[in-house]
């Protein structure tokens, strides 16, 4: 009753995780990937949506995203998200928004969200235009930019995105975040 959804995030590219077959490397192990999703969906019993995030693959020679997306769809995931980079890329280079489009064309019954290189509201609009994704997943782009979510809401509501906050407003926001009690 306290959980709105569970995201199975197979997007971690950090070598200390992937060299042991975890994180972004796990979808390469298709049977294990399938078992994890099937188990999570089964345990949720249609009460909690299970979403799955993954990368394009280990590297350009080991792309797994189309198969991973199909497995997630077949096993009952409610939605999938693609970080449009390989594990090898880590966070370098440009996200391949065309890969998100290919995944969107490959998946027929669940929403496909795109992730990667969303730093400003107009980036999200452009990613959705290029990829035809059903939505965006914001990662590093919101770190230090909490106003990004407000701007995204404005843009997707058909309004102009508000201006970037002043230095004073940013300082105040960060100060408040550090003063807020953690429970």
Where do the model's predicted regions map?
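Alpha/beta enzyme core
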Residues: 3-6, 10, 15, 20, ...
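Glycine-rich beta-to-alpha transition loops that act as phosphate-gripper elements at the mouths
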Residues: 54-59, 111-122, 140-142
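Catalytic cores of alpha/beta
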Residues: 63-68, 118-134
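Glycine-rich phosphate-binding active-site loops on the catalytic face of alpha/beta enzymes
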Residues: 133-149
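C-terminal helical cap(s) of enzyme catalytic domains, especially alpha/beta-barrels
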Residues: 145-160
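Acidic, proline/serine/threonine- and glycine-rich low-complexity intrinsically disordered segments
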Residues: 169-171
């Amino acid at each position: 009753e306290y959980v709105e959804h569970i995201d199975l995030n197979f997007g971690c590219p950090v070598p200390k995780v992937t060299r042991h077959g975890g994180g972004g490397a796990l979808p390469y192990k298709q049977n294990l990937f399938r078992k994890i999703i099937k188990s999570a969906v089964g345990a949720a019993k249609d009460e909690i949506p299970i979403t799955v995030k993954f990368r394009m693959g280990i590297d350009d020679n080991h792309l797994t995203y189309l198969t991973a997306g199909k497995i997630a769809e077949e096993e009952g995931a409610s939605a999938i998200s693609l970080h449009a980079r390989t594990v090898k890329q880590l966070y370098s280079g440009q996200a391949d928004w065309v890969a998100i489009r290919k995944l969107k064309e490959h998946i027929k019954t669940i929403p496909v969200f795109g992730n990667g290189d969303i730093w400003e509201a107009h980036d999200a609009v452009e990613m959705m235009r290029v990829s035809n994704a059903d939505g965006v997943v914001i990662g590093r782009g919101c770190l230090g930019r909490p106003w990004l979510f407000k701007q995204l809401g404005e843009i997707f509501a058909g309004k102009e995105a508000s201006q970037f906050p002043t230095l004073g407003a940013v300082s105040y926001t960060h100060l408040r975040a550090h003063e807020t009690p953690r429970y």
